[in-house]
């Protein structure tokens, strides 16, 4: 039934999109007078963005933003030919994306050492991407649809409500433009990778513009018996009747018939001991399914009443279905001859809605300029699911012999069967927030506060039980920045975050919310007249009432407090007309405090103490552009008890692009490009959740692209 629904809805939208270019052709001449939206929504150029909307929900120059913000531009994503948001963030300081190694099913991002709720810190076009991190129903946006990615570091609850303390990842979709622009790509690579993508935008009339973007991806993976398959399309329509009013309608339709692999191997077999193959498959072919169908419909409305008052409203509706069957290992048995294995199954349907209303006023009191923002937002999701669990026959990973694929309802493997529960997981949040950005000469003071009401509910229809929790919480943020005429802007800030109890404990009771606070000092430098941007930030961040996932189980356990202290350095520089550089360094000291599980003073998993990266893009002449990068991830712990370290690793990437129009005028706009990641094909462990659950890093990837820009 759902397949019929998505096909029918997609057919309607695609039919409308196909009609739009015909309408534009019907007008011989179109004089465009409407202006585009906020500057931070406009297409980026090169490797450096100059503004951000994510930090304050208003257009704000980065040089005047008293917070550490990194922006990944469209140019960077194209040059590096990224296939996931995780991959797009590989060269961003303060960000660790190695959670699942070569697996690409989810975009899981740790910021400043915090990964709890790691799929709940992503936003699309200003609204939270409403996934259910307590299930397998988690959304993923293809980076081909994105114009930019802003990483807002540090607690952000004063504007966004619930968030992890390390920050949020703000994805901005490509918008319709009133000028004609098109892109077409064909990519082929190892693991039978095949990608076809297109993107076209144009004006229909003086006040209407459209955009149609689509992509299909198909490939094998580095893992045996695994494939990835995706079909996605994103039509959008923009109406601007005058320079003060705009309405943008969007849809993002995505079908993933095969979501590839998402499992791991023990540390004994990857970090040490008899090493397993990177392609090792711990499952069973007759229980190996991951399908995801997601639809996101949204709109953005804005109106400027006069020179003082303006209003904005963003809203989205999301529907996502996920089907999963997976047999996976959970560590060695007592004599290390066989791997214990488990089974998980899920059939879930998620519906979500979010809306954000913003009233902005540009005022002046005496010599002080004020930009005041008053907002009211609401979000909710409901995920109805059938959750299956069982024990599977153990596996000898070196011979591939498991003794069969029978599933058992008991750990003694005596009773064939599956344990099934019918669940409903619900969450809603409503909040009101107020922000005042004050400017007096070169001083910039920002004060913001928010009050939230959050309700979580877990219903087990099988056990006829309900666990419900309601929390009210106030969050705040304050920052002060001084902007020197030389382009130097030092700042200091304080911010808070609330992370609600979406996660159950071992008894399926909801845990209490986690609260956080951060102190940050930093400096931003932008040479006058330059687009280059340099920044440094020092922070001290503490999260209380921490909950960690008990991998490979799906419940969470209390772990006390976590304190993160660190330094982030970033440079995005246009060194010359031909050379662009992105450089970053992260030092992150993360420790458990007041831990109740014996780990006090230890470092959590997924928190490398040092990370560094460098990417350089050089225009060599004759239409040749060469890019090269190096990424270093320092040592990290394989378990919270700190009994074993994950070794550090260094990876190299490269790209070469040839613009064919330089050699033949008839080929203007055409190009060929080669991208190689992990050039040395280094075999490494990217990260571990525990000593039983470590992820092999991605193998070497070689992809060749033929493209045409017009």
Swiss-Prot record:
The family database entries (InterPro entries) matched by this protein are listed as: Plug_dom (IPR012910), Plug_dom_sf (IPR037066), TonB-dep_rcpt-like (IPR039426), TonB-dep_rcpt_b-brl (IPR000531), TonB_rcpt_b-brl_sf (IPR036942), TonB_rcpt_CS (IPR010917), TonB_sidphr_rcpt (IPR010105)
Alphabetically list the UniProt keywords. Answer: Cell outer membrane, Ion transport, Iron, Iron transport, Membrane, Receptor, Signal, TonB box, Transmembrane, Transmembrane beta strand, Transport
> For the motif TonB C-terminal box, what are the positions?
693-710
An annotated GO cellular component: cell outer membrane
Q: Where is this motif: TonB box?
A: 28-35
The positions making up the signal sequence are 1-26
- SUPFAM superfamilies this protein is in? Porins
Primary site of residence: membrane
Q: Which Pfam families match?
A: Plug, TonB_dep_Rec_b-barrel
Q: Name one GO molecular function term.
A: signaling receptor activity
The organism's superkingdom is given as: Bacteria
Residue ranges of every copy of the TBDR beta-barrel domain listed in the record: 181-710
**How is it placed in the membrane, per its record?**
Multi-pass membrane protein
Domain TBDR plug: residue ranges:
61-174
Enumerate the subcellular locations listed in this protein's record, separating them with semicolons.
Cell outer membrane
Residue intervals passing through the bilayer? 29-37, 65-73, 91-99, 106-114, 137-145, 152-160, 180-188, 194-202, 208-216, 259-267, 271-279, 293-301, 309-317, 353-361, 370-378, 427-435, 443-451, 476-484, 491-499, 517-525, 531-539, 555-563, 567-575, 579-587, 610-618, 624-632, 649-657, 671-679, 684-692, 702-710
Q: What does this protein do?
A: Ferrioxamine binding and uptake, in association with the TonB protein.
Q: Which family does it belong to?
A: Belongs to the TonB-dependent receptor family.
User: Which PANTHER family does this UniProt record tie to the protein?
Assistant: FERRICHROME IRON RECEPTOR-RELATED (PTHR32552), FERRICHROME OUTER MEMBRANE TRANSPORTER_PHAGE RECEPTOR (PTHR32552:SF68)
Q: What is this protein called?
A: Ferrioxamine receptor
Species in which this protein is naturally found:
Yersinia enterocolitica
């Amino acid at each position: 039934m759902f397949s019929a629904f998505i096909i029918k809805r997609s057919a309607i939208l695609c039919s409308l999109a196909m009609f739009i270019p015909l309408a534009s052709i019907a007008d011989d001449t179109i004089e465009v007078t409407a202006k585009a939206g906020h500057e931070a929504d406009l297409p980026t150029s090169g490797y450096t963005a100059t503004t951000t909307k994510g930090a304050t929900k208003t257009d704000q120059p980065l040089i005047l933003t008293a917070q550490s913000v990194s922006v990944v531009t469209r140019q960077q994503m194209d040059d590096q030919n990224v296939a996931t948001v995780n991959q797009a963030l590989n060269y961003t300081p303060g960000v660790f994306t190695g959670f699942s190694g070569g697996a690409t099913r989810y975009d899981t991002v740790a910021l400043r050492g915090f990964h709890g709720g790691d799929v709940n810190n992503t936003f699309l076009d200003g609204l939270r991407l409403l996934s259910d991190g307590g299930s397998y129903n988690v959304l993923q946006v293809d980076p081909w649809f994105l114009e930019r990615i802003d990483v807002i570091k540090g607690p952000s609850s004063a504007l966004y409500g619930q968030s992890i303390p390390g920050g949020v990842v703000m994805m901005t979709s490509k918008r319709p433009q009133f000028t004609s622009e098109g892109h077409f790509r064909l990519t082929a690579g190892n693991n039978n990778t095949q990608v076809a993508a297109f993107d076209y935008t144009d004006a229909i009339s003086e006040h209407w513009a459209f955009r149609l973007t689509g992509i299909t991806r198909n490939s094998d993976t580095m893992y045996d018996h695994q494939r990835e398959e995706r079909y996605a399309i994103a039509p959008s329509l923009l109406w601007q009747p005058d320079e003060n009013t705009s309405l943008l309608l969007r849809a993002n339709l995505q079908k993933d018939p095969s979501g590839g692999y998402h499992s791991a191997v023990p540390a004994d077999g990857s970090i040490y001991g008899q090493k397993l193959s990177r392609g090792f498959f711990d499952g069973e072919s007759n229980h190996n399914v991951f399908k995801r169908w997601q639809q996101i419909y949204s709109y953005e409305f804005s109106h400027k009443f006069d020179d003082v008052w303006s209003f904005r409203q963003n809203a989205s509706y999301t529907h996502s279905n996920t089907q999963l069957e997976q047999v996976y290992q959970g560590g060695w048995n007592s004599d290390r001859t066989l791997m214990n294995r488990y089974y998980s199954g899920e059939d879930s349907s998620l519906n979500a809605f979010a809306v954000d209303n913003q009233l902005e006023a540009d005022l002046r009191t005496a010599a002080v300029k004020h930009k005041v923002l008053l907002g009211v937002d609401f979000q909710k999701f409901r995920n109805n699911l059938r959750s299956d669990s069982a024990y599977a026959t153990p596996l000898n990973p070196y011979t591939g012999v498991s003794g069969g694929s029978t599933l058992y309802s008991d750990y003694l493997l005596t009773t064939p069967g599956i344990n099934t529960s019918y669940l409903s997981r619900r969450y809603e949040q409503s909040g009101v927030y107020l922000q005042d950005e004050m400017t007096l000469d070169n001083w910039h003071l920002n004060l913001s506060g928010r009050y939230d009401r959050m309700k979580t509910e877990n219903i087990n229809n099988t056990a006829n039980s309900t666990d419900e929790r309601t929390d009210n919480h106030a969050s705040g943020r304050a920052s002060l920045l001084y902007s020197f005429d030389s382009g130097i802007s030092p700042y200091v800030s304080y911010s808070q975050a609330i992370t609600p109890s979406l996660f159950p404990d071992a008894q399926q009771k909801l845990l209490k919310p986690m609260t956080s606070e951060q102190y940050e000092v930093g400096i931003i430098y932008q040479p006058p007249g330059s687009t280059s941007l340099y920044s440094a930030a020092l922070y001290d961040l503490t999260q209380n009432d921490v909950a960690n996932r008990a991998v490979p189980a799906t419940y969470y356990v209390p772990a006390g407090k976590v304190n993160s202290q660190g330094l982030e350095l970033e440079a995005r520089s246009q060194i010359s007309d031909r050379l662009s550089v992105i450089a970053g360094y992260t030092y992150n000291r993360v420790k458990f405090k007041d831990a109740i599980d014996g780990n006090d003073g230890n470092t959590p998993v997924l928190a490398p103490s040092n990370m560094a990266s460098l990417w350089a893009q050089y225009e060599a002449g004759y239409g040749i552009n060469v890019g090269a990068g190096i990424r270093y991830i320092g040592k990290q712990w394989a378990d919270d008890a700190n009994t074993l370290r994950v070794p550090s690793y260094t990876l190299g990437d490269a790209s070469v692009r040839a613009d064919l129009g330089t050699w033949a005028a008839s080929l203007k706009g055409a190009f060929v490009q080669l991208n190689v990641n992990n050039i040395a094909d280094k075999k490494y462990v990217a990260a571990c959740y525990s000593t039983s659950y470590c992820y092999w890093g991605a193998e070497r990837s070689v992809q060749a692209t033929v493209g045409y820009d017009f």
